[in-house]
Amino acid sequence: MERLTFSDAGPADWPYLLCLWWRNVRATHGFVAEDYLRAIGAALPGVYLPAMERVRLAWLEVAPAEGDGSDHAPGAGEGHFPTGTVAVPRPSQGRLPAGFLGSVAQRVEMLFVEPGLRGRGIGTALLEDFGSRHPETLLDVNEQNTAARIFYARRGFEVVGRSPLDGAGQPYPLLHLRRLRAGGAGTGQTA
């Protein structure tokens, strides 16, 4: 895996997070209605992100040729965003925003990775960074998001419940997942 660094994200980072979110949902949430995605995207910087106790941003260090001021991260394209919703930020100081995790207490509320960087351990690294501070990790995943369900199962998460509706009462069933840290060592294995 390439070198990753983490930082706590704040309002100055919201444009990065919004770009990552749009690219991710375009790649993984084809089952969600477009108007609902737009509503969530519109609320992300003003409602959802500020409601997080902590948002961790994973940065991928890139060689100068890769982080040369290009307007797009790997896999990005104008077709990923509804017109007028987001300005794509430039890479920052030789690094690209690779993913982020938003949390409240021991609950992961959001985890998104740049689609062009999936499979490189970024999501796992964000979960381990979070899990190192919490003996128990809770999260919800859309039941229709098969790739995410497999991702979490491979990292030791177990289904502990199901809701037929999402948190906003929409017909997108959620699976409630839980993972315990083994022996307090932050290994990511279930206890």
Give the location of each predicted region.
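A short beta-loop-alpha structural element at the N-terminal edge
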Residues: 4-19
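Conserved GNAT-fold acetyl-CoA-binding loop/helix
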Residues: 19-47
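C-terminal "cap" of GNAT-fold acetyltransferases
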Residues: 23, 136-138, 142-149, 154-155, ...
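A short helix-loop-beta-strand connector motif used in the catalytic cores of GNAT acetyltransferases and
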Residues: 46-59, 107
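Conserved beta-hairpin
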Residues: 53-66, 83-99
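Conserved GNAT-family N-acetyltransferase fold
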Residues: 56, 99-101, 106, 111, ...
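A short, internal acetyl-CoA/4′-phosphopantetheine-binding micro-motif in the GNAT/acyltransferase core
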Residues: 107-118, 142
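Conserved acetyl-CoA pyrophosphate-binding loop and the N-cap/start of the following alpha-helix
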Residues: 116-129
